[in-house]
Amino acid sequence: MYVVIINIVLLKVLMVLTITILSGGFSRERKISLMSGKAVKKALDSLSYNAIEIDVNSNTAEKLKKINPDLAFIALHGPYGEDGCIQGLLEILGIKYTHSGVMASAIAMNKAMSKHIFRSLGIDTPKGYIISRGDILKNNIKIDYPYVLKPINEGSSIGVHITFSHEDYLKLKNMFSVIPVHDAGIEEEEPVWITRDLMIIEEYIPGIELHTAVLLDEAAGTMEIRPKNKFYDYKAKYTNGFAEHIFPAEIPDNIYEMTLEHALKVHRFLGCKTISRSDFRYNPKDNTLKMLEINTHPGFTELSLVPEIAKLTKGIDFNELVKIIIEDSLQHKKILEIK
């Protein structure tokens, strides 16, 4: 009898999956990534997985080879984490991972490329184009006020500037005239030029901020965000009390359905996996909906939008959502396995 009990215990030990949590990294969203990583670690511990945290750096490949995990949970945000880089490394190492693959991650992270995809699918998106730092300094801008200037491949509203007037432009020009010695701190509300010579400039869409979650190839729901300030910026996204979350979004039914359809259409077209979040602006004055971007690695703490929508629509708590992501990700084939 004791032998049977011991064998059962050993079997359970052997069946425990080792999951590495990749967080931190090099991007300006490092702080948020570490928060996501800690939340995932807490959930994995409560779910009795063998969870190992890795703060991603140049030695990450060696650490992963040594650990040889059953799965890597990607809790990274921004460049190198959600742009296909870490996904490519994991493919080479033969390690399964969560969220979307190399191609979907790379395309979704590139705002200019994403806008072309949206238009090709018949989805309206703000008018805009790629602009150089030099053209900004010379005021060689082909879009009328107000307009939005943002990095091609950043998240969390980092480096986003809304310009309503010539006075705003002069402030922007002064800011961009300074060439930083290094990247500005992630917590700065008005970061200086982001060590890139190209950005996206697009028309400003007044109205309502909307976020749609896709979970397991199903559009789960759309949330409305009402920031306390004019703009849903870094502080509003990650500071309690700086934005009000309204669910379901208080918009016309046909517009609500349109957000679900657009989010799912882009998710499927790019080949996104497990979860994604699409962002929209709705202008009630002219009844237009514009898709801004799709996020393959949305923020992932218990207070983040996708977990909140999953809880409100499906009754799925954070721990259960983590388990769903893991189980779904383990079923995905690695690129090298696809024939």
UniProtKB/Swiss-Prot annotation:
Pathway(s) annotated for this protein in UniProt: Cell wall biogenesis; peptidoglycan biosynthesis
Pfam families (alphabetical): Dala_Dala_lig_C, Dala_Dala_lig_N
Annotated ATP-grasp domain residues: 115-327
Coiled-coil intervals: none
Domain of life (superkingdom): Bacteria
Residues the entry annotates as binding Mg(2+) 1: D279, E293
Keywords: ATP-binding, Cell shape, Cell wall biogenesis/degradation, Cytoplasm, Ligase, Magnesium, Manganese, Metal-binding, Nucleotide-binding, Peptidoglycan synthesis
Name of the protein this chain belongs to: D-alanine--D-alanine ligase
